[in-house]
Structures are given as C-alpha cells and as structure tokens.
C-alpha cells in the first residue's frame, strides 16, 4: 500500500 493510503478511512 502506498504512503498516505487509508483503506479504513
């Protein structure tokens, strides 16, 4: 997962 990526956001 790339930096700054939030799957739970």
Curated annotation (Swiss-Prot):
GO BP: any one term: vasodilation
Assigned keywords, A-Z: Amphibian defense peptide, G-protein coupled receptor impairing toxin, Secreted, Toxin, Vasoactive, Vasodilator
One Gene Ontology molecular-function label: toxin activity
Subcellular localization: Secreted
GO terms for cellular component: extracellular region
Keyword Secreted belongs to the record: yes
Keyword Protein transport tagged: no
Tissue spec: Expressed by the skin glands.
Function recorded in the entry: Induces relaxation of arterial smooth muscle, by targeting bradykinin receptors (BDKRB).
Protein name: [Asp6]-bradykinin
Species, as recorded: Pelophylax ridibundus
Taxonomic classification: Eukaryota, Metazoa, Chordata, Craniata, Vertebrata
């Amino acid at each position: 997962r790339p930096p700054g990526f939030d799957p739970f956001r």
